[in-house]
Amino acid sequence: PDGSFVRARKGSSTIRVDFHGVPAHAGNHPEDGRNAIDAMAAAIPQLKHLASEIDGTAISTGLVSGGTTANTVAEHASVTFDLRYGSDGDRDELIFRMRKLCLTGFADGVTSDLKIESLGPALPLSAESASLITLINRAAATLRLPSPVWAEAGGASDGNELASFGVAVIDALAPSGGLLHNPNKEYLDLATVEPRLRLIEKALELLAAAKTGASPAR
């Protein structure tokens, strides 16, 4: 919402942990059961705490499910996490620690296993991307537009995938807006449409001129 341009993005992965307990009648023989939901409740804060051990990482609890009926000791439970990280190495280390903790277990008689539902790359600032930043700054100066403000974003984009192939990527050059993922309040700042289009056009001219050796249009 502040109109910043993006030079780096955190990666995003989705991890599910399944818990397997033993069902029993909650009234007659609760001692015969092993509650998967209770194990999940104990596991969530322990797993999320792992992010505090690796700078720049975050774990968000997104989905939970479990049980069959209120009077049955829950045999199954599941929690799905969203992971964020600044490098693929941090991602791999975080998942390794989560898996290790799951193998240790969270409650007697309940097993847990970790599954990777999606695995996304981070988008760190590269030397190739830095050259594009210089070009965008030059385009803004040529048009006498405000100097771009560059930031690191927590949200991932398709640019993350492109960057993983060694492509130079910068992001968020489109018109600005805010309140993402809010179906009733997400908005586009119309005042940013024309300046951003001019900036992109000028940047493409400068990029083409750099490739061909021709002078950019004025």
Residue ranges and their predicted role:
Residues 1-9, 13-218:
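Metal-dependent amide/peptide-bond hydrolase catalytic core
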